[in-house]
Amino acid sequence: MAKSQIWFGFALLALLLVSAVADDVVVLTDDSFEKEVGKDKGALVEFYAPWCGHCKKLAPEYEKLGASFKKAKSVLIAKVDCDEQKSVCTKYGVSGYPTIQWFPKGSLEPQKYEGPRNAEALAEYVNKEGGTNVKLAAVPQNVVVLTPDNFDEIVLDQNKDVLVEFYAPWCGHCKSLAPTYEKVATVFKQEEGVVIANLDADAHKALGEKYGVSGFPTLKFFPKDNKAGHDYDGGRDLDDFVSFINEKSGTSRDSKGQLTSKAGIVESLDALVKELVAASEDEKKAVLSRIEEEASTLKGSTTRYGKLYLKLAKSYIEKGSDYASKETERLGRVLGKSISPVKADELTLKRNILTTFVASS
């Protein structure tokens, strides 16, 4: 197979993966609004602004609603960013945020939702208007809850990098951060060496004082090699947190929790793979020995990657030069299906490393 076809396959797979992990709340734009709304299903639409405090407070409730109704074929749960999509917001008379409107099936004439802004009330409203009987889904919590009983065991574990939010239940900024912080925990839930945690420092004042907490929320990072901890002073968007953890922990996740194309790549072994592919049949065993030697020097999480490089190099020698491209194709097909996150990680690492074999052929 030509290299261009292989790289096209990678790009297509990436698009499939992004679609598979898209938010349960459908994002609408000026261009897509009337292609989705007013058709064969009723639609509940939140018109919001990213800077709006009430919108931030509503966000986790609305996401819970979206998760619950995602399989309901007769109902759409959607949202519009009115900072970006001014035309459609103006058209439907939006003058404050958040504005929630219900569009009946086959109609672009909305009725404004005036009820409580929580998932339970919204679900009751949608079920009534949409003729559905959907129960609210339980939303998994991936943020580790700390207490005085487990704080030292979790935070001071020298095998883990731990990000801790010290918060107070009454703190408005903490409430605004909560949905983003939960997403951060979800992104890194497959990483054994990373923990995203929080502590109610209002209820557990002694721990807050011990770590110099004087305002809420306070975020502190406790890396494996510095359990005194230090303040996190970065941005508070999802991408900011993900970039920080990737840099500090050596992980390679995107904001959807998928491994990036850099995951598993070891530069020194990549260089040896290129030599292996270019080597004559008589020279390949000598290069394989060097790969084995280099892999044995790796430490920490890279030890796993070294073993995978060695295994794939042996398969490349045993099965022939077309092994890498055929195996890459097969992995692409499997990754395009519904598989567990653990399996997806395993196959993505393998595919990433095989990319060097393919590119060097």
UniProtKB/Swiss-Prot annotation:
Its EC number is 5.3.4.1. Disruption phenotype: Smaller siliques and reduced seed set. Disrupted pollen tube guidance. It catalyses: Catalyzes the rearrangement of -S-S- bonds in proteins. The record marks R117 as: Lowers pKa of C-terminal Cys of first active site. GO terms for molecular function: protein disulfide isomerase activity. Keywords: Disulfide bond, Endoplasmic reticulum, Isomerase, Redox-active center, Repeat, Signal. Its main location: endoplasmic reticulum. InterPro entries: ERp29_C, ERp29_C_sf, PDI, PDI_thioredoxin-like_dom, Thioredoxin-like_sf, Thioredoxin_CS, Thioredoxin_domain. Pfam families: ERp29 (PF07749), Thioredoxin (PF00085). The active site is at C52 (nucleophile), C55 (nucleophile), C171 (nucleophile), C174 (nucleophile). One of its GO terms (biological process) is embryo sac development. Residues 23-131, 132-250 form the Thioredoxin domain. Widely expressed. It is found in: Endoplasmic reticulum. The record marks G53, H54, G172, H173 as: Contributes to redox potential value. The record marks R236 as: Lowers pKa of C-terminal Cys of second active site. Residues 1-22 form the signal peptide. Induction: By chemically-induced ER stress response. Disulfide bonds join C52-C55, C171-C174. SUPFAM superfamilies: ERP29 C domain-like, Thioredoxin-like. Protein disulfide isomerase that may be required for proper pollen development, ovule fertilization and embryo development. This is Protein disulfide-isomerase like 2-1.
